């Protein structure tokens, strides 16, 4: 007999060589019917797994969050099975679960069409309703390679041949379809009920542009119809808010082929950019940061010394000149260390908080570029805090408070923190890591945050905090970071004189709140759906006259607004007033100042706020005061 421990603390005895499914059935038939996979000693396994030793067991159903990835992986296999039935000449390659769904890559001469997706999805529904049994099989490596070659699946044969010797070769069979997979999977295809195929894209085999192009089908799958419908509704809303679409409509920016991944900022977009920079500059000055500016083009010797050349060479833009190799900086940190090293630093100078709106360049693959979210030229709201080890907690608490203030000002209050601790391969002793991790944990707790742990995901040079925002339609965006670094000060020979008179290495805290300004503006465009708050809007007040004989007064109003720092636009054309209001509303301008005969006589304006039909009559001085008060809260 073996002892099996359950999540409720109970321990029950079972005969040896019992399966997880049989245990579930012994507990209740309803649990066995709903069961998808088993968690045995913390590891997910198929329900068919034979248990022959004492263990901890948890039976998982579709209600458990861990099963969402199982459902999506099952859906990927179901997609491949449907494709093979409909298009037998197609070769299958890989199909993992990803965030919010899955994909499967196929090799075929003819691209899939939108009509093909509809047919494939219908076939998937049919196969799901068949509720085919899914079974796991252990194969000999050579036989598996020969088998897949014999059925024309050369990509699968190549994958199996590349698996390290000694690793088991497991295949999963459902109906007439068989696939290489580690698993686990649900016991039958019927668990995949709520899914949709989304799109087709190209993808290189093994992600290498030198290899052949494959056809990638993206899909989404969920545990319930309500979850699927909610996700599709969110995508529909996200499409309306797409920053690339709104960027064109609101005349904020554009991209073009001659400068891939580089933003052409238009007047209104550049206004938003500069306003955000002005806002951040005010915040960091109040929090004791200095601001610096470092070169964009730096000799590769610095990047070699810092370690970036070895790790990021392929992502850097480099050029040869005067027998030297120069590189556009992909990040600011090595340059900030150079400033820190100018002159002798004492413990009294610490902490030293050094910020920069640093222009960086990264050679992103053209296929990875995505509007403002993924660019090749970017400016980070970057800062580095040089401090002593005993100052880490206080500096982290201070940063967390600053970050919270900034996010709140932009309307983000749902902030999640991820804590990445020591990886297996790392610099520094366990004692150093213990102190560093404890300092960050203590700081996060003092700042009032809960955190989730990403075990082993820290950089080799220190633990890391990531700050994730949730937007208006439920999407999550990782923006802020705080990365501790023991290594770069050592590599670049940065030091300070301690109170004892000895030289010590400072700890370096890499930190950003927005990340890149480009990406954060993209997030804001989608968060606000283009309706920027008054202080941030590129045009704060638009002036519209009812008749042309009021134009002189309108120009007087505009001059008064501009003289007081209000960003304005105006329309004094002969067009009808309703047309003018509609046009300004479509441009999502927060305040429209309508001027009629009465407003001219009383030196007033009739204010209509975006999204309302109500009008508020204000003097020009009152209007200026309203906008100024809003601006002064932030700028």
UniProtKB/Swiss-Prot annotation:
EC number(s) from the headed UniProt entry: 6.1.1.3
Reaction equation(s) it catalyzes: tRNA(Thr) + L-threonine + ATP = L-threonyl-tRNA(Thr) + AMP + diphosphate + H(+)
Subcellular locations according to the entry: Cytoplasm
Disulfide bonds, paired cysteine numbers: none
One example GO MF annotation: metal ion binding
Residues bound to Zn(2+): 333, 384, 510
InterPro entries: aa-tRNA-synt_IIb, aa-tRNA-synth_II, aa-tRNA-synth_II/BPL/LPL, Anticodon-bd, Anticodon-bd_dom_sf, Beta-grasp_dom_sf, TGS, TGS-like
Transmembrane segments: none
Biological process according to GO: threonyl-tRNA aminoacylation
Sorted UniProt keywords: Aminoacyl-tRNA synthetase, ATP-binding, Cytoplasm, Ligase, Metal-binding, Nucleotide-binding, Protein biosynthesis, RNA-binding, tRNA-binding, Zinc
Free-text cofactor note: Binds 1 zinc ion per subunit.
Coiled-coil region: none
Residue ranges annotated for the TGS domain, each copy included: 1-61
Name of one Pfam family that matches: HGTP_anticodon
Cofactors required: Zn(2+)
GO CC annotation terms, alphabetical: cytoplasm
Region of interest: Catalytic: 242-533
Top EC group: ligase
PANTHER family, sorted: THREONINE--TRNA LIGASE, CHLOROPLASTIC_MITOCHONDRIAL 2, THREONINE-TRNA LIGASE
Function: Catalyzes the attachment of threonine to tRNA(Thr) in a two-step reaction: L-threonine is first activated by ATP to form Thr-AMP and then transferred to the acceptor end of tRNA(Thr). Also edits incorrectly charged L-seryl-tRNA(Thr).
Matching NCBIfam families: thrS
Family: Belongs to the class-II aminoacyl-tRNA synthetase family.
Record note on quaternary structure: Homodimer.
Name of this protein: Threonine--tRNA ligase
């Amino acid at each position: 007999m073996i002892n099996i421990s359950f999540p409720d603390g109970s321990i029950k005895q079972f005969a040896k060589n019992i399966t997880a499914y049989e245990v579930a059935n012994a507990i209740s038939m309803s649990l066995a019917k709903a069961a998808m996979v088993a968690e045995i000693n913390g590891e997910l396994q198929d329900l068919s797994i034979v248990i022959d030793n004492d263990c901890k067991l948890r039976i998982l159903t579709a209600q458990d969050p861990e099963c969402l990835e199982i459902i999506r992986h099952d859906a990927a296999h179901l997609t491949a099975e449907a494709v093979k039935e409909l298009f037998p000449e197609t070769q299958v390659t890989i199909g993992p679960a990803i965030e919010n769904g899955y994909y499967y890559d196929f090799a075929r001469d003819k691209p899939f069409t939108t009509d093909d997706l509809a047919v494939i999805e219908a076939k998937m529904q049919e196969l799901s309703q068949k509720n085919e049994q899914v079974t796991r099989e252990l194969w000999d490596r050579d036989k598996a390679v020969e088998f897949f070659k014999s059925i024309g699946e050369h990509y699968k044969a190549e994958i199996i041949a590349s698996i390290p010797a000694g690793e088991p070769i497991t295949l999963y069979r459902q109906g007439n379809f068989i696939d290489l997979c580690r698993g686990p999977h649900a016991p039958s295809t019927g668990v995949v009920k709520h899914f949709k195929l989304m799109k087709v894209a190209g993808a290189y085999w093994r992600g290498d542009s030198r290899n052949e192009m494959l056809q990638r089908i993206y899909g989404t799958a969920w545990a319930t119809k309500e979850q699927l419908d909610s996700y599709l509704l969110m995508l529909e809303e996200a499409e309306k808010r797409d920053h690339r679409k709104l960027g064109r409509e609101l005349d904020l920016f554009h991209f073009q082929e001659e400068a891939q991944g580089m933003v052409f900022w238009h007047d209104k977009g550049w206004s938003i950019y500069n306003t955000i920079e002005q806002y951040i500059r005010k915040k960091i000055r109040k929090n004791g940061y200095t601001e610096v500016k470092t070169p964009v083009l730096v000799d590769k010797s610095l990047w070699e010394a810092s370690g970036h050349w070895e790790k990021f060479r392929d992502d850097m833009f480099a050029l040869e000149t005067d027998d030297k190799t120069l590189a556009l900086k992909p990040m600011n940190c090595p340059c900030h260390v150079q400033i820190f090293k100018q002159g002798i630093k004492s413990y009294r100078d610490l902490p030293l908080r050094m910020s920069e709106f640093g222009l960086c360049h990264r050679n992103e693959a053209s296929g990875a570029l995505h509007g403002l979210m993924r660019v090749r030229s970017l400016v980070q709201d970057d800062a580095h805090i040089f401090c002593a080890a005993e100052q880490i907690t206080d500096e982290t608490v201070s940063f967390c408070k600053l970050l919270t203030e900034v996010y709140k000002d932009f309307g983000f209050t749902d902030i999640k923190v991820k804590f990445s601790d020591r990886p297996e391969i790392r610099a520094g002793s366990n004692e150093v890591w213990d102190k560093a991790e404890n300092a960050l944990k203590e700081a996060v707790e003092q700042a009032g945050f809960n955190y989730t742990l990403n075990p082993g995901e820290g950089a080799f040079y220190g633990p890391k905090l990531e700050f994730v925002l949730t937007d208006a339609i439920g999407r999550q965006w990782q923006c802020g970071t705080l990365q501790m670094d023991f290594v770069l000060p050592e590599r670049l020979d940065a030091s300070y004189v301690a109170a004892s008179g000895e030289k010590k290495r400072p700890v370096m805290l890499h930190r950003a709140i927005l990340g890149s300004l480009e990406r954060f503006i993209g997030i804001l465009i989608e968060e606000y759906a283009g309706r920027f708050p008054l202080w941030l809007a590129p045009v704060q007040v638009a002036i519209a006259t009812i008749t042309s004989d009021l134009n002189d007064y309108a120009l007087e109003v505009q001059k008064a607004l501009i003289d007081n720092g209000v960003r304005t636009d105006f329309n004094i054309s002969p067009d009808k007033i309703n047309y003018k209001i509609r046009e300004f509303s479509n441009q999502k301008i927060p305040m429209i100042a309508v001027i009629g005969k009465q407003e001219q006589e009383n030196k007033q304006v009739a204010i209509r706020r975006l999204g309302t039909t109500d009008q508020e009559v204000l003097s020009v001085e009152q209007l200026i005061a309203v906008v100024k008060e809003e601006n002064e809260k932030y700028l």
